[in-house]
Amino acid sequence: MSETTQTSQSLYQALWNSADVLRSKMDANDYKSYLLGMVFYKYLSDKMLFFVSETMEEETESLEEALAVYRKYYEDEEIHEDLLAVITDEMSYAIHPDLTFTALVERVNDGSFQLEDLAQGFRDIEQSDELYENLFEDIDLYSKKLGATPQKQNQTVAAVMKELAVLDVAGHAGDMLGDAYEYLIGQFATDSGKKAGEFYTPQPVAKLMTQIAFLGREDKQGFTLYDATMGSGSLLLNAKRYSRQPQTVVYFGQELNTSTYNLARMNMILHGVPIENQFLHNADTLDEDWPTQEPTNFDGVLMNPPYSAKWSASSGFMDDPRFSPFGKLAPKSKADFAFLLHGYYHLKQDNGVMVIVLPHGVLFRGNAEGTIRKALLEEGAIDTVIGLPANIFFNTSIPTTVIILKKNRTNRDVYFIDASKEFDKGKNQNIMTDAHIEKILDAYKSREDMDKFAHLASFEEIVENDYNLNIPRYVDTFEEEEVEPLTEIVAKINQTNATIESQTASLLDMLGQLHGATPEADEELKAFVEAFKG
């Protein structure tokens, strides 16, 4: 397959096939960093080579030709410094010709490749600009997982690079490559199973959440979007699909896991998000607040936090403005409301929309959580509650709920949608289709009662239910069974009895034809038949 004829689907497949080299050596949660890191390095390398060709007005048909052009001008003492300055100014990095992905693959092919060359390439990128600082720190090229000896490690990495060499990643820059990267992340999530929840939100859920956040504001310039538990950044980057001004969206994200944080940084760059429009932070959302410098409040807040995580719940947090207005702290064993209150705190007063996914327990659990829920309801903060189907996430089979929050609402009613049956059965998971998502969105826009699907509950109704938001209290999905006439039931019983009598007679007839091998056995058999007759 030529580089220029690769479709996005074949690009996806080729990327995933390159993982075969690593799949037998470690689980997906480990090898994702290696593969995604090398894809990213190839992208930076290829992009730079083609940029040099364009800058020097040299036509090149392949990466090999582009590398030859780069070498020629790099080695020209008269323009060497100027060339590097132009590259660095445009790219924020420059790669030595011998350390480009294309040059390294040439060495793979002639058997002279050394791991240290790739490691040096990684270091050079990391040291070139703050944007790339520590970006490859999770990729241990000398790990025993890659092979028991340095030679084996060298062979494994070389094999992956050889697979990746055929990919036209620079030609697919922007959303196509970004989407291919998303595809890889999704495949890793499928392979990783339970561990996947920390870095990936399934696309159907992300689609629903993002469309809700942007509803009526698709044309807004400079839309600010915040995810305090951003994982790989997939949820944030859905904005590019639903904003009509995608290049003006400004992304704010925080992630505790360093490996996942680096994944999000790569994801942003591969999606072509301008550097000035991405503000990502590697820290614990439930520790010190972030961001604390303007802007601190956002047009949209999207969150899929780890469910029922533990946190310190230190008494000092009662003085924290994120939590203090709500009377209690989320319990130590369940940080769900701590995440929710953090996101809500960072929501804009006017027209801000927060969409968060949490387990159903937050809707009805008592004690501290009941106090927080009551305070939110009395403030009118909770706008809509959507019950999602069970088993649609990678990390849990439990049903989850999407909660939509807004500030400065004029009333305190809550709209309930029971979408628990809106799915198709998949091989390992339930799947929400576009039709299911549209049905939910249509209901959300209308805010009308729909039989066995949606209900607009007044604040008085919620108070009557003691601030319990369990969806079945508001949306009755009970299906009455059709009453069967007694005459039909009696007829069925008679038919069943007749069938039993007929089959019993047939069995007795067959038993009567049996004979024991000895007189004693024959007598025992006859006694059994008589006992069976009753």
Task: Label each residue range with its predicted role.
Residues 195-303, 308-317, 323-329, 337-338, ...:
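Conserved S-adenosyl-L-methionine
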Residues 22, 216, 346-347:
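Hydrophobic helix-cap positions at the C-terminus of alpha-helices
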Residues 119-123, 252, 274, 329, ...:
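Generic hydrophobic, helix-prone segments enriched in Leu/Val/Ile
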Residues 33, 193, 227-229, 249, ...:
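Short glycine- and Lys/Arg-enriched binding-loop motifs that mark or flank ligand-binding interfaces
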Residues 1-213, 276-285, 387-390, 412-420, ...:
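Non-catalytic, mostly N-terminal accessory regions of nucleic-acid modification and defense proteins
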Residues 2, 6, 288, 295-534:
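A conserved structural/catalytic subdomain of Rossmann-like adenosyl-cofactor enzymes
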